[in-house]
């Protein structure tokens, strides 16, 4: 669905339906005077008498077909004092889905309404971004492998237009809507990659996706293979890919617009295990098919770069994606094996299903040596322990830099990504002691998410601003909503985009 703009006031507006957002106990006919001018039948539409504007309620009001706006799709927001950006996103998604069900080709939203529905701490521009993003996410479907199409399946609307009162579209409104469009595109990219089957979405496939983004947007892309990684000394990463038939890749993608080449980059490292059997420490069969989503960290970074390509922000950003399968094989790493990491530290691998931290530790060392980053953020579906602690809607945030941690948590909350701070207690590092090596890759069952984060902490140089995001819970969902039909969620794409666009606060 395209995002468009119509200026010139109600006399110039044309749409098959207009979505309006209504608070409980506020009359529908008073939502916007310009809309009432364009659709005067709205004040007497019978369906309007029954509409109570409860949260998630959607009503369709039909007018005479001769009018330029023959339908109004009213979406309830509930009580004004309870309104949040998340509720606005959900309302936009619910409204556009109803428009799709009605087979409406062109949909409008009155721009002047956006400021009046903004929660106290936000403005019309933020609401415009959320409405556009929510509407686009509401139309997301993953059905590319269905060969038999449903004849009743409605097509998406062709466009959503913001309807403006003045002669021109304000530049800031245009920018806000385009930002919402860009981040929704990025989340769609991440969702597609997580939802894709592991026989298609291989490390080589992720590399080809990165290269396609590079060609389209001018990003610099490098791809390193198995032999190069081994010769570089990435023994921990190699211990994971040793048993896999699909060849591993380390993907580097860089956004460096003119004038930013000398900046210290913001570096994101994303776990890219395209299928995780657990290796020799084999997982149970139940739900193993969901382990195709164990590359959600890498997918989020590719989604970020897809969004950056649409907005071209003046900031240097690097993505590092260590990608492999974790498979059992005659060559696979055995529990008890000892490997030497890129940092020179040795690790005793007690459990081959704790593989994410092994490829991440080498990637983190590589990133620090090569770029001396302004800040270093890794994200990974790392531990089931984090899901046990926080559930499926909240990610774990491990960071001993208060300013960086606050930036991630606050910006994430604004855009619908929830993070909760968890500790990096130094005493827990005792859990990672090995009798035969510098470190063990696992500790006791208790505090599993903290132990994993502390393992990564051993590979962060002094003075480096670092955060670890354990996104195992919210990266994939079985729960359907107006914003997501289930499966990959695109979690963290928007948070990363906000960190790039707003910058990292000083420590």
From Swiss-Prot:
The record lists Mn(2+) 2 as bound by: 271, 276, 294, 355
Q: Which residues form the active site?
A: 283, 357
Matching entries from SUPFAM superfamilies are given as: Macro domain-like, Zn-dependent exopeptidases
- Asked if the record carries the keyword Cytoplasm, the reply is yes
Q: Which residues bind Mn(2+) 1?
A: 276, 353, 355
- PROSITE patterns per record: CYTOSOL_AP (PS00631)
Task: Indicate the secretion signal residues.
Answer: none
Task: Provide the cofactor list for this protein.
Answer: Mn(2+)
Task: Respond yes or no to whether keyword Secreted is given for this record.
Answer: no
Q: Which UniProt keywords apply?
A: Aminopeptidase, Cytoplasm, Hydrolase, Manganese, Metal-binding, Protease
What Enzyme Commission number does this protein have? 3.4.11.1, 3.4.11.10
Q: Which Pfam families match?
A: Peptidase_M17, Peptidase_M17_N
Return one GO MF term: metalloaminopeptidase activity
**UniProt GO BP:** proteolysis
Cofactor binding, per record = Binds 2 manganese ions per subunit.
Please report any disulfide bonds recorded for this protein chain, giving both cysteine positions.
none
GO CC aspect terms:
cytoplasm
Gene3D superfamilies recorded for this chain? Leucine Aminopeptidase, subunit E, domain 1 (3.40.220.10), Zn peptidases (3.40.630.10)
Q: Which reaction does it catalyse?
A: Release of an N-terminal amino acid, Xaa-|-Yaa-, in which Xaa is preferably Leu, but may be other amino acids including Pro although not Arg or Lys, and Yaa may be Pro. Amino acid amides and methyl esters are also readily hydrolyzed, but rates on arylamides are exceedingly low; Release of an N-terminal amino acid, preferentially leucine, but not glutamic or aspartic acids
| Origin: domain of life | Bacteria
State the compartments where it is located. Answer: Cytoplasm
* Function comment: Presumably involved in the processing and regular turnover of intracellular proteins. Catalyzes the removal of unsubstituted N-terminal amino acids from various peptides.
Q: Which family does it belong to?
A: Belongs to the peptidase M17 family.
Q: What's the name of the protein?
A: Probable cytosol aminopeptidase
Name of the coding gene: pepA
């Amino acid at each position: 669905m395209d995002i468009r703009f119509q200026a010139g006031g109600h006399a110039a507006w044309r749409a098959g339906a207009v979505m309006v957002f209504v608070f409980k106990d506020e009359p529908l006919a008073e939502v916007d005077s310009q809309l009432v001018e364009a659709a005067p039948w709205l004040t007497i539409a019978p369906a309007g008498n029954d509409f109570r504007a409860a949260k998630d309620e959607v009503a369709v009001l039909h007018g005479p077909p001769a009018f330029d706006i023959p339908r109004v799709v009213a979406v309830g927001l509930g009580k004004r004092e309870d309104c949040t950006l998340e509720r606005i996103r959900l309302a936009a998604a619910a409204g556009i889905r109803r428009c799709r069900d009605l087979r409406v080709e062109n949909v409008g939203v009155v721009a002047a309404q956006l400021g009046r529905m903004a929660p106290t701490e936000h403005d019309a521009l933020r609401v415009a971004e959320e409405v556009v993003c929510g509407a686009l996410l509401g139309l997301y479907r993953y059905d590319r492998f269905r060969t038999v199409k449903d004849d009743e399946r409605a097509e998406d609307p062709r466009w959503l237009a913001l309807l403006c009162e003045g002669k021109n579209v304000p530049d800031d409104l245009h920018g806000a809507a385009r930002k919402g469009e860009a981040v929704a595109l990025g989340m769609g990219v991440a969702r597609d990659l997580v939802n894709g089957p592991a026989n298609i979405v291989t490390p080589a496939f992720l590399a080809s996706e990165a290269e396609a983004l590079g060609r389209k947007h001018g990003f610099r892309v490098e791809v390193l293979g198995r032999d190069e990684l081994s010769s570089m000394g990435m023994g921990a990463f190699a211990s994971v890919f040793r048993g896999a038939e699909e060849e591993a890749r380390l993907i580097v993608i860089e956004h460096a617009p003119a004038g930013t080449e000398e900046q210290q980059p913001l570096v994101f490292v994303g776990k890219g295990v395209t299928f995780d059997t657990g290796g020799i420490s084999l997982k149970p069969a139940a739900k193993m098919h969901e382990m195709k989503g164990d590359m959600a960290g890498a997918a989020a970074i590719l989604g970020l770069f897809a969004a950056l390509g649409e907005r071209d922000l003046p900031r240097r950003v690097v993505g590092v994606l260590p990608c492999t399968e974790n498979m059992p094989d005659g060559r696979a790493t055995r529990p008890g094996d000892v490997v030497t990491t890129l940092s020179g530290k040795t690790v005793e691998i007690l459990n081959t299903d704790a593989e994410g931290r092994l490829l991440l530790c080498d990637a983190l060392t590589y990133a620090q040596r090569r770029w001396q980053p302004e800040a270093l953020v890794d994200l990974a579906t790392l531990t089931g322990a984090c899901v046990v602690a926080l559930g499926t809607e909240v990610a774990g945030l491990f960071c001993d830099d208060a300013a960086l941690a606050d930036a991630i948590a606050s910006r994430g909350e604004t855009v619908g990504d929830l993070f909760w701070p968890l500790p990096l207690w130094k005493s827990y590092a005792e859990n990672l002691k090995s009798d035969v090596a510098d470190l063990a890759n696992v500790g006791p069952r208790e505090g599993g998410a903290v132990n994993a984060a502390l393992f990564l902490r051993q590979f962060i140089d002094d003075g480096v601003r670092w955060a670890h995001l354990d996104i195992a819970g919210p990266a994939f969902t079985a729960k359907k909503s107006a914003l997501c039909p289930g499966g990959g969620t695109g979690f963290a794409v928007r948070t990363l985009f906000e960190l790039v666009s707003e910058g990292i606060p000083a420590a």
